[in-house]
């Protein structure tokens, strides 16, 4: 029950503090030390813990700590349990706290090349984050975090989830909630994995104890009175719980039989009558979201929303999840072109282009010619593909790495449309480079760790890299502002300036929407001088997706969350965030006047020693082209 140490145990079992424990309560806790599972007072067989308590009390008499008279009094007392289950699911930033716990464990157990602990106590052992009195200083701003969590809940629970249920309700019954084109074998495989991975199936198949949640190694099969059971074996350190054993046919029947159950409904649970199988399908149709917000000048993470409800969905969609990023990757392609001599005002053909057998299209047509600025504002696929073809996939990959993308990228033309599967963590870090004068600062969430005496045992030392010239970075900001401001007559992010509940933000904002193939993932990246924020929305299973592009595009899924979030942040007088414009680099006007470079090679001499140039403009396809019909969003 996560009762670690006497303080925690006193709270969990008796709802008190150590100084207030009675003799009989103390004896019961001491009795548990040898085998907490066997002597646990919460077991159905209460006689075990009472007998164990009696042993401890008798030892106290033996060694003079208790009189015979008091022994008789305490021996006859009831258990007096006031159970308080410990849960880390509630409270602010639960996803972040779990990532923090794992990172602290990594830091405190880090070793040098010789295998010695880098940070250790005076006795040479590793620090324990729970018991050694450490002080951990993080970058999270609780006020910004509260607004972020509220924004995710507001859009999904009140608007988007209902629209999604309605949108997919028209699907064939046998396919629900998956898209109609899914192959039977794929649907069956996904459902089989979901069934076997469910807690109910793991319990019924003897892989998990229903009481203490111990895994298979603690569980034994037993037979009694002609029936088979599973037992969480006490001889193996289990809790002694027993439950009926079923064969596969019995398990299948259970999964198809409606029972009273609670199902998730954003922000709450509702009681219903549903079969376990239909419950799995229902929960696969739940939309998920993540948000991360960074201060670009420091790399400090101010808000981290890894999902919609940590109690029910533990998977973190900021750090752990990797999803196709869609058009949010296009700014890196455009930045490569600017870095190698293009200008925001340059006209670029949007006519269809084929690179090998890959021929991307634009959603709703839209060919002809565009300026670089307006092509990005309208997320024109063929322009991104043409720029990738002209300036080379290797140069785009090179820049992406300098901007903090650590996940290996597919060196294929369709990378220009965002076929790469990346974590939100990396995308926000890369995008924040544009708002920080071209300087990439690795996103950081731990500032320092102090021991109980106040000595610093760890201090963050993030990677810092001048990935882009400040002038190029400022050009990118001006182009991404057109996505939101509508200065090109349109833009995929212009609804941020509209009249919807989440919109109407008047302050300078740059941005980029993203929508992946078949409306699977919706993204929005929003940039202001003091905060760069990324939002992802989608179902956990990529085969569960919107039918309608109008509903599934990033402008309708991710952007509203960003809008709700920033409106709250701007309205909070306790949060000191700039409402001004992005700072123009010194000498930028001269840079614009003098920028008349006609070849990538000349630009290389002027700007950067580490810029990789492929003069032929040809793309080296080191991997099979992934291909995509990624939407123009």
Pin down the residues of each PLM region.
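Substrate-binding clefts and substrate-entry loops adjacent to catalytic sites
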Residues: 32-42, 122-130, 357, 374, ...
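Mid-domain, small-residue-enriched loop/turn segments at the edges of structured enzyme/sensor domains
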Residues: 360-364, 392-431, 438, 442-445
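Long, low-complexity, intrinsically disordered segments
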Residues: 618-633
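A penicillin-recognizing enzyme superfamily signal
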Residues: 138, 142-158, 188-212, 218-235, ...
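Short active-site loop at a secondary-structure junction
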Residues: 283-289, 312-332, 345-347, 370, ...
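Glycine-rich, acidic and aromatic/proline-enriched surface loops and short helix-turn segments
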Residues: 2, 19, 23-35, 102-113, ...
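Non-catalytic, structured segments within soluble enzyme domains
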Residues: 1-210, 217-235, 401-402, 406-408, ...
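Conserved catalytic neighborhood of penicillin-recognizing serine enzymes
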Residues: 16-19, 84-96, 342-396, 440, ...
């Amino acid at each position: 029950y996560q009762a670690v140490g006497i303080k925690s145990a006193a709270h969990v079992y008796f709802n008190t503090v150590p100084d207030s424990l009675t003799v009989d309560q103390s004896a019961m806790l001491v009795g548990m030390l040898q085998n907490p599972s066997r002597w646990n007072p919460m077991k159905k067989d209460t006689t075990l813990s009472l007998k164990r308590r009696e042993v401890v009390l008798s030892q106290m008499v033996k060694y003079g700590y208790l009189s015979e008279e008091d022994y008789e009094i305490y021996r006859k007392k009831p258990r007096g349990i006031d159970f308080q289950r410990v849960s880390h699911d509630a409270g602010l930033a639960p996803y972040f706290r779990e990532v923090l716990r794992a990172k602290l464990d990594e830091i405190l157990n880090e070793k040098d090349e010789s295998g010695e602990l880098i940070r250790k106590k005076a006795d040479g052992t590793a620090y324990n984050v729970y018991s050694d009195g450490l002080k951990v200083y993080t970058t999270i701003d609780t006020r910004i975090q509260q607004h972020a969590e509220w924004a995710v809940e507001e859009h999904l629970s009140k608007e988007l989830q209902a629209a999604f249920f309605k949108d997919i309700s028209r699907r064939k019954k046998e396919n629900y909630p998956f898209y109609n084109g899914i192959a039977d074998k794929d649907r069956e495989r996904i459902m089989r994995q979901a069934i076997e991975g469910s807690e109910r199936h793991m319990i019924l198949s003897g892989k998990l104890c229903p009481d203490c949640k111990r895994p298979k190694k603690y569980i034994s099969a037993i037979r009694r009175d002609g029936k088979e059971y599973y037992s969480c074996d006490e001889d193996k350190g289990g809790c002694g719980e027993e439950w009926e054993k079923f064969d596969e046919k019995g398990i299948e029947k259970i999964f198809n039989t409606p029972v009273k159950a609670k199902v998730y409904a954003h922000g709450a649970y509702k009681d219903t009558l549903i079969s376990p199988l239909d419950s799995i399908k229902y929960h696969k149709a739940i939309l998920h979201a993540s948000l991360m917000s960074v201060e670009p000048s420091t790399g400090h993470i101010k808000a981290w929303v890894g999902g919609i409800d940590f109690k029910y969905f533990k998977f973190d969609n900021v750090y752990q999840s990797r999803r196709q990023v869609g058009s949010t990757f296009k700014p890196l392609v455009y930045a490569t072109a600017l870095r190698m001599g293009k200008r925001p005002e340059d006209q670029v053909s949007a006519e269809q282009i084929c690179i090998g057998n890959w021929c991307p299209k634009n959603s709703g047509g839209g060919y002809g010619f565009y300026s670089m600025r307006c092509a990005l504002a309208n997320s024109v696929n063929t322009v991104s593909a043409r720029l990738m073809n002209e300036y080379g996939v290797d140069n785009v990959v090179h820049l992406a790495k300098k901007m903090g993308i650590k996940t290996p990228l597919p060196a294929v033309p369709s990378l220009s449309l965002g076929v790469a599967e990346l974590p939100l963590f990396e995308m926000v870090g890369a995008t924040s480079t544009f708002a920080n004068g071209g300087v990439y600062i690795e996103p950081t969430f731990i500032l320092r760790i102090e021991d109980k005496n106040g000595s610093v045992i760890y201090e963050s030392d993030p990677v810092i890299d001048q990935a882009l010239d400040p002038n190029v970075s400022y050009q990118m900001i001006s182009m991404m502002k057109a996505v939101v401001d509508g200065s090109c007559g349109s833009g995929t992010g212009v609804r941020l300036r509209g009249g919807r509940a989440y919109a109407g933000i008047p302050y300078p904002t740059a941005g980029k929407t993203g929508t992946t193939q078949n409306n699977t993932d919706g993204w929005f990246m929003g940039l202001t001088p003091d905060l760069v924020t990324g939002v992802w929305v989608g179902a956990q299973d990529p085969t569960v997706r919107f039918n309608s592009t109008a509903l599934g595009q990033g402008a309708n899924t991710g952007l509203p969350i960003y809008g709700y979030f920033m409106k709250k942040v701007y309205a909070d007088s306790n949060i000191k965030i700039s409402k001004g414009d992005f700072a123009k680099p010194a000498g930028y006007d001269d840079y614009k006047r003098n920028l008349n470079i006609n070849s990538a090679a000349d630009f290389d001499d002027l700007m950067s020693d580490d810029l990789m140039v492929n003069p032929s403009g040809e793309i080296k396809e080191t991997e099979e082209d992934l291909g995509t019909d990624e939407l123009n969003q």
